[in-house]
Regions:
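Alpha/beta-hydrolase-fold enzymes
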Residues: 121-210
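Conserved small/polar residues in nucleotide/adenosyl-binding loops
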Residues: 253-254
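Alpha/beta-hydrolase active-site loop
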Residues: 82-103
Length: 254
């Protein structure tokens, strides 16, 4: 049996209660902690089956809904907007706050980041990587600096006319162009989805409002700023050299 507990903590933005959850064996005894950082336009409870699987194997699993996602966003209008100011620093600060609440001196501590969460984890490791037992970077990428800088410039240009909370169809199309085009991107052909080969999960994803909202310009800008940061050599070198890291690519990546 697995026990699930939900709780909140105050975000680094100073005003938002972050929704979080932990899964652990029903006897309360666990051998290590596994923290998950979810991806773009989803929420931590999408990982519930995976978390329950690990808890059944003797791990405590923790994770939270990033700002602008899931139950951390108080209304649908809040979805897709992280925060004013330096959002990437706030986001990784929230990840560290959850770690501080969950880590014990005698238990190994691992972190996993998927998709957008993988970029956040890479940034996190360059700042807070000390003391971890290992990290899993899943579904990440290596983008040229020029691409991220161009994307940020486009966001700024549109925001000058529309504001940072504008949900831009152009940025969405730009973000999900290229290799994404050969996959189903709206759930009409779940057997060819970019998400997973499990068609039941694909159908759930596209029926769930917490997975189908649009990012704001500010969120795209903050994400691209993080992409730019993590691909800089000087920031990669800030990650502890002795930290074991597993890089788990998508099935068609090389």
């Amino acid at each position: 049996m697995v026990v699930k507990q939900e709780f909140t903590f105050l975000s680094g933005d100073g005003k938002t209660d972050v929704h979080a959850a932990r899964w652990l064996p029903d006897n309360g005894d666990y051998r290590a902690v596994f923290q998950i950082s979810h991806g773009m336009i989803e929420f931590i409870e999408r990982y519930e089956l995976f978390a329950a699987f690990l808890a059944d194997k003797g791990y405590m699993v923790v994770g939270h809904d990033h700002l602008g996602h899931g139950k951390t966003a108080k209304t649908p209008e809040d979805w897709g907007y992280f925060a004013d100011g330096e959002s990437p620093e706030i986001l990784i600060g929230d990840m560290n706050k959850l770690r501080t609440l969950s880590q014990e001196p005698d238990k190994p501590y691992f972190m996993l980041g998927h998709s957008m969460g993988s970029y956040l984890l890479r940034r996190y490791l360059s700042v807070y990587g000390g003391g971890l037992s290992g990290a899993v970077i899943m579904g990440t990428g290596a983008n040229p600096d020029a691409v991220a800088k161009l994307g940020m410039a486009v966001c700024k240009a549109i925001a000058a006319f529309k504001g940072w909370k504008y949900r831009s169809p152009f940025m969405e199309k730009l973000f999900f162009s290229g290799d994404f085009q050969k996959f189903d991107m709206d759930g009409t052909h779940p057997e060819n989805s970019w998400l997973t080969k499990d068609t039941e999960i694909v159908r759930f994803y596209y029926s769930e409002p917490r997975c189908t909202f649009k990012f704001t310009l500010k969120a795209y800008y903050d994400f691209l700023k993080t992409v730019y940061y993590v691909n800089r050599k000087e920031n990669v070198e800030k990650i502890p050299k002795d930290l074991p890291i597993l890089i788990a690519p998508r099935s068609e990546e090389r």
